[in-house]
Amino acid sequence: NVASALLEQVKYGDQSRYLRKLSLSQIKKLKGKDMLAIYDKVRSVQCDLHYCGTLPVEKVIGTIRQHLPLERTTVASNSPYYRELKQYDRPTVFFIDMPDMAQSIVYGYVKGDPVDDKASRHASQLFSVYFGGDMSSLMFQEIREFRSFAYRTSGRYQLPNHAHKGTAGSFTAMLSTQSDKTLDALGVLDSLIREMPLKPERMEAVK
């Protein structure tokens, strides 16, 4: 949707998945031979194969070899792919003005510091659940349940895959609310971020 496309642009710039995928007009111009060439190129990239079933291993291997030329998978895979996060040196607000809409979808994004250790990874997971991960989180309870300032809330600190140690994570928060409640909801979110209340009983549940 529009809000998701804007968030991708803010976080990743030209690396936004909405900018990198082919447009409908470009797809219509593709020829059959172009698609086959792309498929052949994809088959040369190294991959992991998973099978769940009752067939003997030898039969599974034989079936795979019939359809995938494993001896030609010589191109190293860069999966999971890492996209560099954008850094902003001052608070910046991006708008998409849609006058006929009665609802606001607001995202907040902050690029974090590089993290390598396991303790920080576990801490980020705990924080995400505690702060905005589900219906018992701070965001949901304080913004939606107690004050009815939003329809939906979420807030998570996301770290890159283990394969990309030393790269930055990011904090992303989201509010979906009525236009006339937007500033009120943002005010509560700001207070939760700046002075996050500690609720010991909730921490035990998160663990």
Where in the sequence are the language-model features?
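Hydrophobic alpha-helix feature that most strongly marks membrane-spanning transmembrane helices
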Residues: F131-M135, M139, R144-R152, S191-E201
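Charge-rich, well-structured scaffold segments of protease-associated domains
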Residues: N1-N78, R152-K207
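His/Glu-based metal-binding/catalytic segments typifying zinc-dependent metallopeptidases
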Residues: A76-E142, M174
